[in-house]
């Protein structure tokens, strides 16, 4: 745009031109002012633009800084979240480690306890095995001795059988010679001769059974049952004839007399025996006569002077028949023992006028007194050998004890307690209320109330562990122990002087006491 400040107006211009020039000058001034204003405005705008640009750059820089801070904050937050997660995981891991350590210590303690208990049980089992081994060795030695004694007794019985055959031959010869003098006794003589051979052989066989211990209980039960089959309706036994060996002379007279003298004596004794047969057939005894099939069959026993009533004893009851055989076993043992000693004395004194190989062997055996003294049979003390005890064990003892359900006893402890009960060696003592054992649960039924506390403790041996027991379980234990003690008394012959009816009534009372203690009605539980 041209600069108009240096333009000069010519003096000799036309007025119209002057007017036009004045207007142009005014317009020029106006335009100049506008131009100046526009320039100033542009400069201001440039300044403002520069300022805004600078401000924009500052804002952009600030935005970049804030964005950087924001991204850094986001990454920090993420790292912080990760840190919190890791911290929680660390706490969980520490908790698991503590739990694992406590569990490890508990398992180690249990392992130590189990190891100690295992060693104790192993030592106890080894000790029991050693005891059983020693007992089995003793039993084997006893069986060997009994076998030797059985062989000795067998040779003795064979010698007796040979002598009895000689006596039978001599009696038959004398019978043929004196048949005309004694015609009524011919039939009786043959009957007696048959009974002599058969009865002596049966008695010898039963003595061997008792000595060797083979099937003793079965043979006794079978003999009792077979004898009970001959009972009549009223319960009385038929008249039983005595064994012919009962009428023989004493050992002194037999050793001092010859064969002919013994034949005459036997003939006189046959007359007396026939008289006894006639008297027994006409007037049978009121009480049953028991003729034992043991070697002591020469003695007539009448153990029960009064016949028991049918309400107390029932011969059709298998349980009573088993108890009858169990009750008679000690008496049979005593009779067989005395009869065996008598037969041994008889076998040691052979006739003087006869010498045979069997008598020579008998004289050789008689010179050894230890063999005759050691060959006396021993009575069985084991209750398990009797069928009556097996019945009571199944029907009364096991339901009363219920040791299989005893939660506080281990298997070995149950076995030792049951063995102690059968051996009558169980120990039951009262407990004081301040004892630590009284606050423990009952070992048999698990009774664990605080009121009342356990008042008793029991153990199988004096040096064994004590077990707490409540009053109910003690009543059961005592009832079973009383019954087992009663059976041991019968085995030892304490009840031999009493009648069968009295022993049977006492047995029923003991079994009833076990039932009452089992249902909780024992006398110890009253009140």
Swiss-Prot record:
Cellular component aspect of the GO annotation: cell cortex of cell tip; cell division site; cell tip; medial cortical node; meiotic spindle pole; meiotic spindle pole body; prospore membrane
What would you give as a GO molecular function for this chain, any one?
guanyl-nucleotide exchange factor activity
| Any one GO biological process | exocytosis
Family matches, as CDD domains: Rab11BD_RAB3IP_like (cd21044)
> Compositional bias (Polar residues) spans?
256-270, 342-361
Oxidoreductase is among the record's keywords: no
**Alphabetized UniProt keyword annotations:** Coiled coil, Guanine-nucleotide releasing factor, Phosphoprotein, Protein transport, Transport
Q: Which SUPFAM superfamilies match?
A: Sec2 N-terminal region
- Residue numbers of Phosphoserine PTMs: 75
Q: Which residue intervals make up region (Disordered)?
A: 233-305, 342-376
Biased amino acid composition, Low complexity = 271-305, 362-376
Which InterPro entries does the record associate with it? RAB3IL/RAB3IP/Sec2, Sec2_N
- Coiled coil ranges (UniProt) are 40-171
Q: Does the keyword Calcium apply?
A: no
Give the similarity note: Belongs to the SEC2 family.
Function description: Guanyl-nucleotide exchange factor for ypt2. Catalyzing the dissociation of GDP from ypt2 and promotes the binding of GTP.
| Stated name of the protein | Rab guanine nucleotide exchange factor sec2
Q: Which organism is it from?
A: Schizosaccharomyces pombe (strain 972 / ATCC 24843) (Fission yeast)
């Amino acid at each position: 745009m041209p600069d108009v400040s240096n333009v000069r107006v010519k003096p000799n211009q036309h007025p119209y031109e002057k007017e036009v020039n004045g207007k142009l000058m005014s317009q020029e001034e106006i335009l100049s002012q506008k131009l100046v204003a526009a320039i100033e405005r542009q400069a201001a705008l440039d300044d403002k633009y520069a300022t805004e640009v600078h401000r924009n750059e500052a804002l952009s820089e600030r935005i970049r800084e804030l964005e950087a801070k924001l991204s850094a904050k986001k990454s920090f937050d993420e790292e912080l979240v990760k840190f919190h997660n890791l911290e929680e995981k660390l706490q969980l891991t520490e908790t698991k480690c503590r739990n694992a350590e406590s569990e490890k210590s508990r398992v180690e303690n249990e392992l130590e306890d189990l190891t100690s208990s295992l060693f104790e049980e192993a030592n106890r089992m080894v000790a029991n095995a050693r005891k059983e081994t020693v007992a089995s060795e003793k039993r084997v030695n006893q069986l060997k001795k009994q076998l030797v004694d059985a062989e000795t007794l067998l040779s003795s019985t064979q010698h007796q059988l040979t002598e009895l055959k000689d006596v039978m031959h001599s009696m038959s010869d004398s019978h043929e010679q004196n048949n005309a003098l004694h015609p009524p006794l011919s039939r009786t003589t043959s009957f007696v001769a048959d009974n002599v051979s058969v009865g002596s052989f049966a008695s010898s066989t039963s003595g061997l059974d008792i000595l060797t211990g083979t099937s003793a209980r079965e043979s006794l039960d079978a003999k009792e049952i077979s004898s009970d089959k001959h009972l009549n309706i009223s319960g009385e036994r038929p008249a039983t004839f005595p064994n012919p060996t009962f009428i023989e002379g004493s050992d002194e007279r037999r050793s001092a007399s010859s064969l002919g003298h013994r034949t005459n004596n036997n003939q006189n004794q046959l007359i007396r025996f026939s008289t006894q047969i006639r008297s027994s057939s006409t007037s049978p005894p009121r009480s049953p006569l028991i003729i034992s099939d043991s070697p002591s069959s020469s003695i007539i026993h009448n153990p029960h002077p009064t016949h028991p009533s049918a309400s107390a004893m029932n011969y059709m009851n298998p349980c009573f028949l088993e108890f009858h055989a169990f009750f008679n076993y000690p008496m049979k043992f005593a009779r067989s023992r005395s009869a065996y000693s008598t037969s041994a004395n008889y076998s040691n004194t052979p006739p003087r006028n006869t010498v045979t190989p069997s008598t020579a062997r008998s004289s050789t055996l008689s010179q050894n007194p230890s063999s005759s003294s050691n060959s006396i049979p021993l009575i069985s003390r084991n209750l398990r050998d009797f069928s009556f005890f097996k019945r009571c064990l199944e029907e009364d003892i096991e339901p009363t004890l219920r040791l299989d359900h005893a939660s506080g006893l281990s298997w070995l402890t149950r076995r030792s307690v049951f063995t102690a009960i059968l051996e009558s060696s169980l120990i039951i003592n009262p407990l004081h209320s301040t004892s630590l054992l009284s606050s423990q649960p009952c070992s048999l039924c698990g009774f664990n109330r605080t009121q009342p506390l356990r008042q008793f403790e029991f153990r199988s041996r004096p040096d064994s562990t004590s077990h707490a027991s409540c009053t109910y379980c003690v009543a059961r234990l005592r009832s079973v122990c009383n019954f087992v003690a009663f059976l041991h008394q019968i085995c030892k012959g304490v009840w031999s002087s009493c009648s069968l009816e009295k022993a049977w009534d006492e047995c029923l009372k003991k079994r009833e006491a076990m039932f009452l203690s089992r249902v909780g009605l024992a006398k110890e539980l009253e009140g």
